[in-house]
Amino acid sequence: MLGLTEAEKIKICLQKQVNSSFSLHNGFGGNLYATEEKRMFELVKPKAGASVLNQSTWIGFGDSRTDQSNSAFPRSADVSAKTADKFRSLSGGSLMLSMFGPPGKVDYLYQGCGKHKVFYEGVNWSPHAAIDCYRKNWTDIKLNFQKSIYELASQSHCMSLVNALDKTIPLQVTKGVAKNCNNSFLKNPALYTQEVKPLEQICGEENLAFFTLPTQFGTYECKLHLVASCYFIYDSKEVYNKRGCGNYFQVIYDSSGKVVGGLDNRVSPYTGNSGDTPTMQCDMLQLKPGRYSVRSSPRFLLMPERSYCFDMKEKGPVTAVQSIWGKGRESDTAVDQACSSTPGCMLIQKQKPYIGEADDHHGDQEMRELLSGLDYEARCISQSGWVNETSPFTEEYLLPPKFGRCPLAAKEESIPKIPDGLLIPTSGTDTTVTKPKSRIFGIDDLIIGLLFVAIVEAGIGGYLLGSRKESGGGVTKESAEKGFEKIGNDIQILRSSTNIAIEKLNDRISHDEQAIRDLTLEIENARSEALLGELGIIRALLVGNISIGLQESLWELASEITNRAGDLAVEVSPGCWIIDNNICDQSCQNFIFKFNETAPVPTIPPLDTKIDLQSDPFYWGSSLGLAITAAISLAALVISGIAICRTK
């Protein structure tokens, strides 16, 4: 280049832009000044009602409110046609009606498979049904039945009613009926009677019968059966046998002779009440497949003839929907109580009375809204509702049970903020960039760019190092290594400290349910605090990587200017050039520094800064993926801030 006199020199630099409107963001290996900032995540609010994690892996069991074959459908339904198609339903039916088979009631073969099971049935066996059969009020039996169904369903992929058990009954008995059972009797248990003419101490023969619980029913595998062990309860021996010969007993034995259910008044006392009519009690037994025997005192034999079978192959969520009548009909709370006392069961309850559209009892708008989420897939389902947003934080603690990628409770002000808008890098403390060191721009250097930060979902993938595109731009692996090493170490420290705290909390577990709930809440809070800490580390790493990337991008821009200038300009310091005003006039300067004011600055490839936080099942309780992608684009606007400074 020709020598230049002082009078001919013009110094062109990148103008300083930082002022009081900028905020400083510190990061690993580099800092940023920014005109704006935003939280890494916003708080989400759960939607009330039911939803599912996967549309292809759930099944429902219902009645007329989910029955597409009902003549009043869809006005009679509380779900959409799409959701009704997922239900196994029949108007007038219920799982308990099919289990016991009272005379004159709907008897439907409930069966199906799904990881998540939704139960919206039960109202058809309620006080309004007025089922007697030696029992004026069946609510406590219904409660135990529904609870057992929910418990076993939560551990099984498939379930089915077994409506005909193989059995062997004694020759001396015949099918019996009862006046208070519509002159008939239940299909399960079946009543068998023995005609006897009692003499002193002689009351007929003891009944001995057998039934077999199958290992398979049709295509359904049976690892465990729910069996109703029913027996009569007498207030006194005299009520059972007025001549005083013998005591009542009805006992079920397994193949080894062990008692598994029933009542034996030979060893257990009578109630001592003053009633003259027995009542029937039914206990819910969970029995493995096999051959069982039933022994009963003369006169009466109650024989198990049905069961529900479960394959016990897969644990999954259970949702129970409150099943009540509209005005004028008496309901019970058995479904509510059963679900609330069963681990893993989410209860959906109305806040208002049931008001139907098709009639008083079918097509309630509030219930339709609560069940509308069954049309969608959620990221998280819980007792508090369902969430489909990707944010890991919610304002309120989500009540258990909960499944999926559930957000943790956090205060908005505790969520870290990341820089946004106009960004200017500082040189920071990074020493791994080697292009060359004099090229690293400090706080006195300008860059005007647009930063687009998108928070996207990612699967479990461990920690991914930032990568540099072959064509230039982005973060070098070397410049990110120290930051990633630090984030890895800090996260391990956080997790170790949290796990130690959780172990201490475990020592405080007692059998008191409230203490366990309190413990669960404390663990959730510990998880939230740890995640916020990890996000703080991620934010610092992100800021550092963006800062380094911007510095590199600025260096590439400076290199482009130097290359265009050739011998017409001398770079005297990072971002500053001296030219001869007589040799390079305004149009020449426009060509070098403003690219003729026509061609944009070549777009810098996106800054690839991805981080996947791998979830630890013990630590998080569900799979949680975070990915932060930062992209930087420089346009012709970059050059518009260049100022010309004359030096003599």
From Swiss-Prot:
Residues 8-33 are annotated as: Fusion domain-1. GO terms for cellular component: host cell plasma membrane; membrane; viral envelope; virion membrane. The chain crosses the membrane at residues 624-644. It comes from Influenza C virus (strain C/Yamagata/4/1988). Glycans are attached at residues 19, 54, 137, 182, 388, 545, 596. It is found in: Virion membrane; Host cell membrane. The active site is at 64 (nucleophile), 359 (charge relay system), 362 (charge relay system). Homotrimer of disulfide-linked HEF1-HEF2. Its EC number is 3.1.1.53. Residues 151-303 are annotated as: N-acetyl-9-O-acetylneuraminic acid binding. It catalyses: N-acetyl-9-O-acetylneuraminate + H2O = N-acetylneuraminate + acetate + H(+); N-acetyl-4-O-acetylneuraminate + H2O = N-acetylneuraminate + acetate + H(+). This is Hemagglutinin-esterase-fusion glycoprotein. Residues 645-648 are cytoplasmic. Pfam families: Hema_esterase, Hema_HEFG, Hema_stalk. Disulfide bonds join 13-576, 203-245, 222-309, 230-282. In natural infection, inactive HEF is matured into HEF1 and HEF2 outside the cell by one or more trypsin-like, arginine-specific endoprotease. One of its GO terms (molecular function) is sialate 9-O-acetylesterase activity. The gene is HE.
